[in-house]
Amino acid sequence: MSKKPAALIILDGFGLRNETVGNAVAQAKKPNFDRYWNQYPHQTLTASGEAVGLPEGQMGNSEVGHLNIGAGRIVYQSLTRVNVAIREGEFERNQTFLDAIKNAKDNDKALHLFGLLSDGGVHSHINHLFALLKLAKSEGLTKVYIHGFLDGRDVGPQTAKTYIQQLNEQVEEIGVGEIASISGRYYSMDRDKRWDRVEKAYRAMAYGEGPSYRSAMDVVDDSYANGIHDEFVIPSVITKENGEPVAKIHDGDSVIFYNFRPDRAIQISNTFTNKDFRDFDRGENHPKNLYFVCLTHFSESVDGYVAFKPVNLDNTVGEVLAQHGLKQLRIAETEKYPHVTFFMSGGREEEFPGEERILINSPKVATYDLKPEMSAYEVKDALVKEIAADKHDAIILNFANPDMVGHSGMVEPTIKAIEAVDECLGEVVDAIIAKGGHAIITADHGNADILITETGEPHTAHTTNPVPVIVTKEGVTLREGGILGDLAPTLLDLLGVEKPKEMTGTSLIQK
């Protein structure tokens, strides 16, 4: 029997704006997208800020986008969750923080605060550090030391001094805290098992080993003089007048790691917490029995306490499809495969009953501007075959190109990327329509829509622009003011499935 599949097609990084300069989305020839846009009901969706559980004005990203899409509701991201906790006074009542402070106070130990020193909002936010300093002060701590990781990636490449200045002012105002070490995130936040980098950061923090300076500003000045920008600043130790380190991390000290995004926090955390750590020799006197607090849950491998525990997402789109006995397919190339599986399922690794997954390998190239089509054609070929085989009721697909090539900040390759995706989109959607099915064509956030900054530099980051949504169903209208959290209810609506109460998003199809 022929299936009439409903598909959710995510054009990753495909934002909309009117200005065409530096806008690969507008400049690309995309006859298929344009045809669907003109022929079928369409609207725009908000994919950034509080609409996706981020702070207002914060650009969205693929993880956040797919989490919201799959959950069918606004999923408050760690950054917003912590901001709200600070705003509403929950932060200073957080028992995990208070226990870490008590450990330091009762045992005459130090409290070490470490994390990324910027307001980039991707891995951390400097305001969370300031809130911790205020809390330490209000609880009467005096031995409070900061190990700052310089960013230069989620913010400008030479912005460290701005953040160090802000920190110095806050320390002065609050009356507690001293910078003990500084390192570029390249070392302290590696996630690719380059342990030689991590070891340099670890030794600066634990042993006070590395280049030494009288102030954090001196570290940055010297680095810049040697052509080294924030991200790559060599782990350095701040010393007192007598040349001794301001602080080292000692046995039994308390540590609060205020990064909220896990991936780049795991390795350095394991280095401090794992009894069986073997990736490099930590030395005989490495600090033991630390009261180690992670802001959020980093990994099972990290032996520490968690201040903001994970929120379980029940009844995501995949779970609801499974409950109704519907067969679903998730398909993407490597770069976005975790997004259509793990993130779309609310942070769940395993498949739901009736769920099939197809992973197409991303091409092995140094950077994707060298192969803007990536593996879009292979993804399309595999999917068209699946549609013909009548196996699936629901399909969730991601085309990675506009985002991955857009990160190059290069207009021509990104135009090529979008044109390749458009060609593939046409074949996929036409195959679905030929089966009597429907497609929702949308995006998770912007990127390819701004590739040149106002000063003419390459723009490599995501954008806060709205994203398109097209539903290939004649005779219906879509409501305005939609968000990514409305997409799962819309998909369920197309399949005639009632959305669960946990999904606070609503179908975009007006009744």
From Swiss-Prot:
A GO biological-process term: glycolytic process
Cofactor binding, note field: Binds 2 manganese ions per subunit.
InterPro entries assigned to the protein according to its UniProt record, in alphabetical order: Alkaline_phosphatase_core_sf, BPG-indep_PGM_N, Metalloenzyme, PGAM_B_sf, Pgm_bpd_ind
Pfam families from the UniProt entry: iPGM_N, Metalloenzyme
Reactions catalysed, as given in the entry: (2R)-2-phosphoglycerate = (2R)-3-phosphoglycerate
Main EC class the enzyme belongs to: isomerase
Binding site residues for Mn(2+) 1: D403, H407, H462
SUBUNIT field: Monomer.
Protein name: 2,3-bisphosphoglycerate-independent phosphoglycerate mutase
Gene assigned in the entry: gpmI
